[in-house]
């Protein structure tokens, strides 16, 4: 029987990069990992209205470089960069080292799995029918250039007594192909009937090893 694995984790080191890039010896590893978890939790909570897709953390020397990928960069930056400065000071308190915060705008939130999952979850919390929410998200993703999308919702759907899972797919989503650029994310909808889980897979096309090398070189230049 086939076993399901996280589509992001299985592609790490091949077409995906780690979201935390730093080195630590065995005595400091757990402390730094715990810091990363706390920083991510703090930022996701603080920037709940900013549609944050992912947070990358780098630790060059005795500093920290945090890149926030968001669909609403204006909310994070604030007037004349005031909000981002406050954020930097708060993260500095958490980590205890100098912190640099960079903001990267998500150009197409319709094909970002995390943002799509959170959007569907928010609609479920507002009592929108799950099939309508799924259909709307899939149509928007396919219009924005996705090659395929699959959405699954699990829980007491529509207030049913027995929890169940429902899913819908448009296009193709190849989970077995390592070079397939499949974005995967989950979210939770807190409804009056209980928690409803949302899973989203978005296929954006194939990435070849040469293309990955080009991306890394471009990052180093910038």
Swiss-Prot record:
GO CC, one annotated term: cytosolic small ribosomal subunit
GO biological process: translation
KH type-2 domain mapped to chain residues: 39-107
Keywords: Ribonucleoprotein, Ribosomal protein, RNA-binding, rRNA-binding
Coiled-coil region(s): none
InterPro entries in the record: KH_dom (IPR004087), KH_dom-like_a/b (IPR015946), KH_dom_type_2 (IPR004044), KH_sf_prok-type (IPR009019), Ribosomal_S3_C_sf (IPR036419), Ribosomal_uS3_bac-typ (IPR005704), Ribosomal_uS3_C (IPR001351), Ribosomal_uS3_CS (IPR018280)
Disulfide bonds: none
Record GO terms (molecular function): mRNA binding; rRNA binding; structural constituent of ribosome
PROSITE patterns the UniProt entry points to: KH_TYPE_2, RIBOSOMAL_S3
Gene3D superfamilies given in the database record: 3.30.300.20, Ribosomal protein S3, C-terminal domain
Domain of life of the source: Bacteria
Family assignment from sequence similarity: Belongs to the universal ribosomal protein uS3 family.
Assembly, per entry: Part of the 30S ribosomal subunit. Forms a tight complex with proteins S10 and S14.
NCBIfam families in the cross-refs: rpsC_bact
Function recorded in the entry: Binds the lower part of the 30S subunit head. Binds mRNA in the 70S ribosome, positioning it for translation.
Name under which the protein is recorded: Small ribosomal subunit protein uS3
Organism field: Francisella tularensis subsp. tularensis (strain SCHU S4 / Schu 4)
Lineage: Bacteria, Pseudomonadati, Pseudomonadota, Gammaproteobacteria, Thiotrichales
């Amino acid at each position: 029987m086939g076993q399901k694995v996280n589509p992001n984790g299985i592609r790490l080191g091949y077409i995906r990069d780690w979201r935390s890039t730093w080195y630590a010896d065995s005595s400091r590893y757990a402390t730094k990992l715990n810091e990363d978890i706390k920083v991510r939790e703090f930022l996701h909570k603080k920037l709940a209205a900013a549609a944050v897709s992912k947070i990358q953390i780098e630790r060059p020397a005795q500093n920290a470089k945090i890149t926030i990928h968001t669909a609403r960069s204006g909310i994070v930056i604030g007037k004349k960069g005031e909000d981002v400065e406050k954020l930097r000071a708060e993260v500095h308190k958490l980590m205890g080292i100098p912190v640099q915060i960079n903001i990267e705008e998500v150009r197409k939130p319709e094909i970002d799995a995390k943002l799509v999952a959170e959007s569907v979850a928010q609609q479920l919390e507002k009592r929108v029918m799950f099939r309508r929410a799924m259909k709307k998200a899939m149509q928007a993703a396919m219009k924005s250039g996705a090659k395929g999308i699959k959405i699954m919702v699990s829980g007491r759907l529509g207030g049913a007594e027995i929890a169940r899972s429902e899913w819908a797919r448009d296009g193709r989503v190849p989970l077995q192909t390592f070079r397939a650029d499949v974005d995967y994310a989950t979210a939770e909808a807190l409804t009056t009937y209980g928690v409803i889980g949302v899973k989203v897979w978005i296929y954006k096309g194939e990435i070849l090893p040469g293309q990955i090398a080009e991306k890394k070189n471009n990052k180093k230049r910038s």
